[in-house]
Amino acid sequence: MDEHRKNVLLVNDLPCYGKVALNAVGPVLSAMGFELYRLPTAIFSNTLNYDFAEAADMTEYMRRALAAWQTRGVSFSGVCTGYLHTPQQAELILSLLQRQTSAFVMVDPVMADGGAFYRGLGESTAQAMRTLAAH
């Protein structure tokens, strides 16, 4: 297998407390021999099932990291998305997928629990997820 064929991009939030999102999927894929690129969409003080979580939006960082990887010529055999903090983040991933046409794509539309959107998310996020999932 070519070295670039083992690169997987993980796009998800990073809770500083909790065993979900980037904290969960990374170790499994790493143990399977994949080279992982982690692209955090937001950094949270804790998981969103608590009454309060401090959040840092990572949209601008995502833009810069994707540009840096493009400059290096990094290609991905797989792209796995989870929680997206803004609809603009879906646009960034769609732009990447237009360049990386052979990547296997898995979209997990993490945006709600119990029929209610997570704080700060809404219909625009749902539409962005629909567009991304249809790719």
Where are these regions (language model features)?
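Small-residue (G/A/S/T)-rich helix-start motifs and N-terminal tracts that mark the onset
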Residues: 1-78
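Conserved residues at beta->alpha junctions
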Residues: 12, 83-84
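Soluble or luminal CAZymes and related metallo-dependent hydrolases
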Residues: 58-61, 85, 89
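Conserved beta-alpha-beta core of the PfkB/ribokinase-like small-molecule kinase fold
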Residues: 81, 87-135
